[in-house]
């Protein structure tokens, strides 16, 4: 019987999509489990159609879930399991009232799971309101901070910040870098400045439309873009297998946020690099971070400015976009077969393949981009020809 039995609330669309993907993977061997994602930024109509067909598990963001409840298009009357993922970030984003409104629509007799990277007073208060004698489980970190090399660089004037960012990218030349900025405007300014100086860089923030966000994440995760400049909120839920470097464009306002930022690099036994830029006006934050880490922040000599004359790092991969996706029954194997068929490119030159409802993306090595593009344009997928283009910029 199709009824919503479990509800998972996430702060961002990216995290909701990631959670839904993992749930679908886990449910593969359970017959006919339907998992539905309901997030803002996506059209409302298709969500209504999906709800009419029913679902067992709904994963979504508070704003869109609350909207469906207001319009009477979502019934939570039979939910037996409620999950709040990254609850601290949801409250930071101002979703407290939405969360309370949603919880009021869920039966009181239920299992409630609340996950939070931090445990401030706001989370204690939320737990007290929505949970009944909860058990606290503290997960020990399996991430070894010793695998991360931390560097701090101090400069006098704030107007030097963009130049300092380029200087660090020239100095360390990481293949993939996540730059954390505090505001949407800074992400755009940072990415624009880097592109104007030859870097492959994109911005990620909460105001991007869903299609644009998907494309940004595809290009960064498949290594056809080397620098992603993002806000903390937009970066939540990012699932990047191997991240070479994290750069803090500013020292984080909260020391715990700093630790979570740099913990994205140096995973799975690999070495990580974390660089933090701060101006003289941020000295107090550096002091507070040092107290939190239990060590004095020692800043290093800035790299030589002559490095700015060097060419920027070029990503090893290029992304090709195909105007056909899941709705046209296009699968990764179809794309790989079309690329590597007679007179095609070598299989080892093909990277990550991402399939969406109406489009697909495939990464190929830079030196194979032209023959790969020719091969896809001249061939067919599922017996059909699709428009194919190389994504640049």
At which residue positions do the language-model features occur?
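Conserved helicase RecA-like core
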Residues: 1-393
């Amino acid at each position: 019987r199709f009824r919503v039995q479990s509800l998972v609330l996430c702060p961002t669309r990216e995290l909701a999509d990631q959670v839904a993907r993992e749930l679908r993977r886990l449910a593969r061997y359970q017959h006919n489990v339907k998992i539905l994602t309901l997030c803002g930024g996506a059209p409302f109509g298709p969500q209504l159609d999906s709800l009419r067909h029913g679902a067992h598990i709904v994963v979504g963001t508070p704003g869109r879930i609350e909207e469906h409840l207001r319009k009477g298009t979502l019934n939570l009357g039979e939910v037996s399991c409620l999950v709040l993922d990254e609850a601290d970030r949801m409250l930071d984003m101002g979703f407290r009232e939405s969360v309370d409104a949603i919880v009021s629509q869920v039966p009181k007799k239920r299992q409630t799971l609340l996950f939070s990277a931090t445990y401030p007073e706001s989370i204690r208060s939320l737990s007290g309101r929505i949970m009944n004698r909860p058990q606290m489980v503290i997960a020990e970190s399996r991430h070894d901070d010793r695998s991360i090399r931390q560097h701090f660089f101090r400069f006098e004037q704030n107007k030097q910040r963009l130049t300092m960012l380029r200087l660090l990218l020239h100095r360390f030349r990481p293949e993939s870098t996540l730059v954390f900025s505090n505001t949407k405007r800074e992400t755009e300014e940072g990415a624009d400045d880097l592109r104007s100086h030859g870097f492959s860089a994109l911005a990620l923030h909460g105001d991007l439309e869903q299609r644009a966000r998907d494309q940004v994440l595809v290009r960064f995760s498949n290594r056809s873009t080397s620098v992603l400049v993002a806000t903390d909120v937009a970066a939540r839920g990012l699932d990047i297998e191997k991240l070479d470097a994290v750069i803090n464009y500013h020292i984080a306002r909260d020391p715990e946020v700093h630790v979570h930022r740099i913990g994205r690099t140096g995973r799975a036994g690999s070495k990580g690099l974390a660089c933090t830029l701060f101006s003289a006006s941020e000295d107090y934050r550096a002091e507070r971070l040092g107290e939190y880490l239990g060590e004095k922040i020692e800043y290093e000599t800035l790299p030589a400015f002559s490095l700015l004359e060097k060419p920027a790092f070029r990503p090893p991969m290029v992304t090709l976009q195909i105007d056909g996706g899941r709705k046209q029954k296009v699968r990764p194997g179809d794309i790989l077969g079309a690329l590597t068929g007679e007179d095609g490119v070598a299989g080892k030159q093909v990277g990550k393949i991402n399939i969406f409802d109406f489009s697909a993306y495939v990464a190929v090595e830079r030196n194979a981009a032209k023959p790969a593009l020719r091969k896809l344009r001249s061939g067919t997928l599922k017996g059909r020809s699709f428009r194919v283009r190389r994504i640049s910029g």
